[in-house]
Curated annotation (Swiss-Prot):
Part of the high-affinity ATP-driven potassium transport (or Kdp) system, which catalyzes the hydrolysis of ATP coupled with the electrogenic transport of potassium into the cytoplasm. This subunit acts as a catalytic chaperone that increases the ATP-binding affinity of the ATP-hydrolyzing subunit KdpB by the formation of a transient KdpB/KdpC/ATP ternary complex. The system is composed of three essential subunits: KdpA, KdpB and KdpC. This is Potassium-transporting ATPase KdpC subunit. Signal peptide: none annotated. Keywords: ATP-binding, Cell inner membrane, Cell membrane, Ion transport, Membrane, Nucleotide-binding, Potassium, Potassium transport, Transmembrane, Transmembrane helix, Transport. GO terms for molecular function: ATP binding; P-type potassium transmembrane transporter activity. It comes from Allorhizobium ampelinum (strain ATCC BAA-846 / DSM 112012 / S4). Its main location: membrane.
Length: 191
């Protein structure tokens, strides 16, 4: 009996050590050596203070800042512990009501024209840190007015923060909202 169990126990211990300890430690070591900022969560700092992560969206509610995508996380917006989509299907009346309310709120802030989809829908994770360049461009007038800055200066900040497609073909152009708002604060401090 023991002769039958010994190989199973040996393999269990071996693969637990290999897959549960050796491999994660090796990958962590390589990541820390090659890409330390990314391995540590792409933390964004202002001076010595941590202000967020470039990979996780934040709620910016003041008109002085560009707004992030809506968050789908339950209970509290942008809660990384509750990451996930809404699971509402395209035919869901609740989803249609949420989008209609978001469109109304978007237009109530003085914005006109077509509403970018990412301005009224959440991402699959509910934590997307980026918005489309069009979404950012449509917020320029509101942010410029709230900050008493020339629209052309705010628009230039948006264009400077547009990140192109990866390798020219993967994904869509995007704007990281946290980095844009930090650039906005820095520009406002110099005026």
């Amino acid at each position: 009996m023991l002769s039958h169990l010994r190989p199973a126990i040996t393999m269990t211990v071996l693969f637990t050590g290999l897959c549960g300890l050796a491999y994660p430690l090796a990958i962590t070591g390589v990541a820390q050596a090659v890409l330390p900022a990314q391995a540590n969560g792409s933390i964004v700092t202002k001076g010595d203070a941590v202000v967020g992560s470039a990979l996780i969206g934040q709620a910016f509610t003041s008109p002085r800042y560009f707004a992030s995508r809506p968050s789908a996380t339950s209970n509290s917006p942008y809660n990384p512990l509750a990451s996930g989509g809404t699971n509402l299907g395209a035919t869901s009346q609740k989803l249609k009501d949420q989008i209609a309310a978001a469109v109304t709120a978007w237009q109530a802030n003085g914005r006109s024209g077509p509403v970018p989809a990412d301005a009224v829908t959440s991402s699959a994770s509910g934590l997307d840190p980026d918005i489309s360049p069009e979404n950012a461009r449509q917020q320029v007038a509101l942010v410029a007015k709230a900050r008493n800055m020339p629209e052309k200066d705010v628009a230039a900040l948006v264009e400077a923060q547009v990140q192109p497609r990866l390798l020219g073909v993967i994904g869509e152009p995007r704007v990281n909202v946290l980095r844009l708002n930090m650039a906005l604060d820095a520009a406002g401090a110099t005026q």
